[in-house]
Design a protein with these regions (language model features):
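Catalytic-site signature of metal-activated, phosphate-bearing donor transferases
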Residues: 65-67, 94-284
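Short, acidic, metal-binding catalytic loop of nucleotide-sugar glycosyltransferases
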Residues: 21-30
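Active-site acidic Asp-centered loop
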Residues: 37, 86-88, 95
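Cell-envelope/extracellular polymer assembly enzymes that use nucleotide-activated donors
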Residues: 2-4
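Short beta-strand/loop segment that forms part of the nucleotide-sugar
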Residues: 29-39, 54-56
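Active-site beta-to-alpha loop of glycosyltransferases that engages the nucleotide-sugar donor
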Residues: 7-18, 38
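Active-site-proximal specificity loops/subdomain of glycosyltransferases
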Residues: 42-85, 93-94
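Conserved acidic residues
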Residues: 30, 81, 89, 112, ...
């Protein structure tokens, strides 16, 4: 079994090492591909066996990013049995029990491409301390927010073309209930706040701004904190935690997929607040 992982970065001093550690353990570091927009923080300077592809840091264009990553993924599936394609704060994790690891899933699961159940890792700031990135992440975080917008088709054996944001694609999404994507963007208040400053300082292309691509990356600080930390803390503190069962959401997700001009658009407005099962909290 030969599998690869592909990501796209700029100054990801926290998330990129976690991405390399996780996917490197599953696929081998020589099978990881990092597209680097000329990072300046040293995070891409000494990547060892990881393949670094440097591109010019022009004004960030979400459409160009999607096209570049699609083209790279299309090429890599000619040489690998499967390819993971996504941002470096997105870790694809199988249900621990049926599968021992992501490598085990790729080796044994029957799929041509697969859509993950998307879970945003939460930092409940009045219950949980600051994250120690040198220790297992999920052992330090209990809660997650299911979001239909993060149910991404990230793992594939066949070529895929994505729209900006990598949410929508040219194949009908197919969720596997045994495959999750943990989005670590909000796993820690301090880390996320520093990352949001980098995002807000980024120059965006006219096309991305006119289409409102990546709007959440440009949130002001107050809105960013409210939506990602204060609101989740209020929900969890009030005891509004639901069972770790997404049957209802998956049914609505699949029914809500719309095809437009050869691309499949997913519902973006479904949420569920859950406690991460102990077995999954050993994943990374």
């Amino acid at each position: 079994m030969k599998a690869a992982a592909l990501t796209f970065v700029y100054n990801e001093s926290v998330n990129l090492p976690l991405w390399i550690k996780y996917y490197g353990a599953n696929f081998g570091e020589k099978n990881l591909f990092v597209i680097d927009r000329e990072s300046t923080d040293g995070s891409t300077s000494n990547l060892g066996d990881v393949n670094r592809i440097v591109i010019p840091r022009d004004a960030f264009d979400d459409r160009k990013k999607a096209d570049f990553m699609s083209s790279m993924q299309n090429a890599l599936v000619n040489y690998y049995d499967a390819v993971v394609c996504g941002d470096c704060d997105e870790l694809v994790v199988p249900n621990i029990g049926p599968y021992a690891s992501l490598a085990d899933y790729v080796a044994r699961a029957d799929f041509d491409y697969v859509t993950c159940i998307g879970l945003n890792v939460l930092h409940i700031i009045n219950q949980e301390t600051a994250l120690d990135v040198n220790k297992p992440i999920l052992a330090q975080r209990r809660y997650a927010r299911f979001m239909s917008a993060t149910c991404k088709t990230m793992l594939s054996r066949v070529p895929i073309r994505w729209m900006p944001g990598l949410h929508c694609l040219d194949r009908r999404p197919k969720i596997d209930r045994n495959l999750f994507m943990f989005h670590t963007k909000t796993m820690d208040y301090g880390i996320a706040s520093a990352r949001q400053k980098i995002n807000r300082d980024t120059a965006w292309s006219e096309d991305s701004l006119s289409q409102n691509f990546g709007a959440h990356h440009r949130y002001d600080y107050a809105k960013f904190v409210r939506e990602n930390f204060l609101d989740p803390a209020n929900v969890i503190n009030q005891g509004n935690v639901q069972p770790f069962d997404f049957s209802e959401e998956i049914a609505k997700f699949e029914a809500g997929i719309v095809e437009k001009e050869g691309f499949f658009w997913i519902p973006m407005d479904m949420n569920r607040w859950v406690e991460i099962p102990d077995a999954l909290r050993t994943a990374f």
